[in-house]
Amino acid sequence: MKRILYIVIGISLTACLTEVDLSDLRESPRLVVNGVAVAGEPLRLSVTRTWFYTDDHPNVVIPDATVRLYVNDHYEETIPFVPGDTLFNAAGSYQAAFVPKMADRLRLEVSAPGYEAIHAETVIPQASQLLEAKAVREVSTADSTVKRVVYSISFQDAVEEENYYLFRLEEGNLINEVDSMYSWRVLYLDYAEEPLFVQSTSALDQILFSQYLSGYDGRVFSDETINGKSYTIRLQTSTHYVSEATKRLRVRLYAISADYYRYLKTLQDQSDRSFANHLIDAGLAEPIRVYSNIDGGLGIFGGCAPNRMEVDYE
């Protein structure tokens, strides 16, 4: 009887197997362009192609693409491919002689043999206006063993414009007083303490998950609630030990294009601890689709104007 039972179980398990032909899901490869035009820096771009997830990570760099750059509706140059690229950690990248400036409107037209031609546009925004940066060491009123550093960064938002920003704080430890050399690290902060970063989260997330918002490499925000006003961002770090040595605070406030903001925002939303992501992890919701402004392809072509301020604190 037991032998018959094993046979029946084996037959039933075999019947549950279904072969899926993944080749039916394969699409024709498309061009992928990734690059951020930074005011004051030569334009650099990565041109690759899409690949199927069973392809075992092939080399997808496209070295023979034709990349034409237009600036303010005028042809500027055909950007050459330069082999070997430590910045992108790739076989090479497209490096232009052109250096964009604020308010420039850029357009890319990219084509390559065997692929559909694509194009993308972006605008370099005006740089942010940093007003003041401060860092103050404090002792917690609730627990005297807990020390913290409170950071206050003030800036002015442009009037009657939709503005988008990427904010990041770095801390430097003095390692060579003679040459004023610092060892820098990005500050790991909880952005949930600052209303400006909470504005883009849902009401449900603010109730359930307001205790933490990540952003090790910085966090993006818009001027939706502060349009045309001066504003002070307040954040803090808490620990049982805060070094008394003199440190340097570096504030980075990048003004970024709307498309670049939407792209970074989707990446940010993917990493946040949110109700939507819990549903996605449980298979109850569609994954967050990464934003792209490449017409006919994938990737991002963004614009950025950097600004920074450094202050010492003790």
Show which residues each predicted segment covers.
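Sec-dependent bacterial lipoprotein signal peptides
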Residues: M1-T14
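A sequence/structural signal for flexible, mid-protein segments enriched
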Residues: L17-E314
